[in-house]
Structures are given as C-alpha cells and as structure tokens.
Amino acid sequence: MKKIGIFYGSSTGTTQGIAETIASKLGVPASDVIDVSKMNADMVKEYEVLLLGTSTWGDGELQDDWYDGVKVLKESDLKEKTIALFGCGDAESYCDTFCDGMGIIYEDIKDSGCTIVGKVSAKDYSFSSSIAVIDGMFVGLALDDINESDKTEERIDAWVSDIKNHLASVSYTHLTLPTNS
C-alpha cells in the first residue's frame, strides 16, 4: 500500500489550513500532514505520493521554509513518486507573481523523474502573470484565500476529485475513493 504525505510551508497559517482541509478530504491522517521545516529525506522516502503546498511571498518568492525543503527534494529519489502541488497567493495585490512559489517548486522537481498530477486551468482566475502557469494550466491547485475565499472550497473539491481519479487505478493507503452519487 502506498502512503500519501502532505508537506506544507506556511507563515501565516493559511497554507497549513489548506493542507489540513485537503488531508481531511483525502482521508490522510494528521500525522501525515507535515510542516516542511521538519521534512527530511527519510520522510520523503516513506511516501510514494507527495502533496506539496506553499504560499508565495514578496515579489514572487518561495515561503521561507521551502528553501531547505527544496534541497531535501533535490537530494531525494523522486523517480517512483507521484507529486501534486498546491499554492496560496494574492492575485490582486501581487497579480504579476500569483502563486509563483508553486512554480518555483515545480521547476525544481519537474526533471526528477516523478509524475506530477493535479494541474488546474488558469482560465477562471484573474491575475496578470505567474511562473506557475504553463500552456494555460497552473502546475497545481492555485488558491487566493484573500480575495476569492468564496471559491476556495469549490476549487479544493475539484482538485481533490482530480487527484482521487488519477490515483484510483492504484491502491493507496489513506485514499478515500470518490463515490458515484
């Protein structure tokens, strides 16, 4: 059985809250929702599915704890891993760097041999620019809980459903498969 680990970097608690919400919707226990500042190579090795969440700070900068987290990921064997990204940003005040932190992590892991899932269309977002967008798709779930908090739950639900559908063909621990209703 494969395990899902959720690693997040959060300075104000928003990304942590999003990570916990995603965990709840996927049935991932709280013990597998980990602050990236505590992440090490053994933890990365333990999970075959990694959900990586970050906020974006300043002028498109990665959340501080992720700088060491990215080093751990680069030193880890990610070839057999399935990875999904989620990011928090402010599309109004920082419309030119919306969710760039997620794009930075993507750039650092994209050539590692991992399988990246959970891309989201950028068409329903209002922003100017983001390095987290490639060919009209965010590299993961982009959230603006400051200006579009009314869309957060719906966006998380759609993304979690996409992740579940992708992973449904393989048996994973902690994964609650979608029901037909």
Question: At which residue positions do the language-model features occur?
Answer:
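FMN-binding flavodoxin-like domain, especially the glycine-rich phosphate-binding loop
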Residues: 3, 25, 29, 34, ...
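N-terminal beta1-alpha1 ligand-phosphate binding loop
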Residues: 4-21
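Charged catalytic carboxylate motif
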Residues: 14, 18, 155, 173
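Short acidic loop-to-helix transition motifs that present clustered carboxylates
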Residues: 35-40
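Short amphipathic alpha-helix with an adjacent loop that forms part of the alpha/beta core around
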Residues: 41-45
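Compositionally biased non-globular segments, especially hydrophobic aliphatic-rich helices
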Residues: 145, 179-181
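Conserved small/polar residues in nucleotide/adenosyl-binding loops
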Residues: 173-179
